[in-house]
Amino acid sequence: MESLNILISNDDGVFAEGIRALAKSALKKGHKVTVVCPDQERSATGHGLTLQSPLRVERADELFDKGIKAWGCSGTPADCVKLALSELLDKKPDLVLSGINHGPNLGTDIFCSGTVAAAMEGTLENVPSMAISVASFKWKNFEFAGEIAMNIAEQAIKDSWPKSLLLNLNIPPCERNKIKELSWTRLSIRKYKNQFSKREDPRGDDYYWLAGEAVLDLKSKGDGPKNWPSDVSQIQENKISLTPVEPDLFWRGSIDVLPKINTSFINAS
C-alpha cells in the first residue's frame, strides 16, 4: 500500500519498549512515522488534559530508529495527540496509533486508559485511530505485537474504516503459534474487589494504594451484531480482540424506562 503519515503516542512514556517497537514496525512497512508521547509514565490518566500549567516538548529522535521524528511531552497522552495535531505536525496524519501498551485495556477499564484516550483524540479529529495493548504486564514480545497491529491497521485503512470509530486492539500474551484467531468483540463490564490497600505511615496517618483485582466481567446489555463475545473472554482463549468504540456515549434505550422528572420546581416561588 502507499506510504502513510502515522502519528504514534502512548501512556507508558517515551522510554517504553512498546512504543519503540510499534514505531519500528510502522517504519519497516515504509510509512512516515512521527512520535509524540509523554516524557514519563502516564498510565491510567484517562482523557485528562493539562490546563493549569504550560506544555513543554523536547525532541527525542535518538530514542527511536533513524528516520523517526519524536517528541517527549510534559502532558498527558491526550495532550500529546492534541498538541501534535494542532502544532507539531506539518499536515494531518492518515492514521493515529497509541501503544503498544504494557498491559491490557479491556472492558470498561478503557475509561481510565491513557492509551485509549490518545487514540480517541485522533478519532475526535476524524483521523482513523487505533489503541494497541498486550494483555499482560510481563510479556515483552512487542515486535510480534507491532507486526499484528500494523497488519490490522493497514487492512482497516484500505477497507471501510468509519472515521467515527476507534479500534481497540488487545493481543493475548502468547507466541504466534498459540494465537487462535481474531475476533470482533464488545466491551465487558469489569468489577473489582479490594480496590484500595490501606496502610499507615510512620506518623500514624492512613494512606491508600489503588490495587484492585478484577473478579467479574459482566455481559453488557448491548451485545452488538451477532451477539459478539466480550473482549475479556477472547483474550482468555488466546484470541486477538478488536473492539470498535464510539466517542458518542449517548444512551440508546427507550425513553419509557427513564426516571420521570417533575419540573414544577423550576417556576416554584
Curated annotation (Swiss-Prot):
Its main location: cytoplasm. Binds 1 divalent metal cation per subunit. It catalyses: a ribonucleoside 5'-phosphate + H2O = a ribonucleoside + phosphate. Gene3D superfamilies: Survival protein SurE-like phosphatase/nucleotidase. The keyword Ribonucleoprotein does not apply. The keyword Cytoplasm applies. Transmembrane segments: none annotated. It is an enzyme of class 3 (hydrolase). It is found in: Cytoplasm. GO terms for cellular component: cytoplasm. It holds the Pfam family SurE. Its EC number is 3.1.3.5. Keywords: Cytoplasm, Hydrolase, Metal-binding, Nucleotide-binding. A divalent metal cation binds at D11, D12, S43, N101. Belongs to the SurE nucleotidase family. NCBIfam families: PRK00346.1-4 (NF001490), PRK00346.2-2 (NF001492), surE (TIGR00087). Nucleotidase that shows phosphatase activity on nucleoside 5'-monophosphates. This is 5'-nucleotidase SurE. It comes from Prochlorococcus marinus subsp. pastoris (strain CCMP1986 / NIES-2087 / MED4).
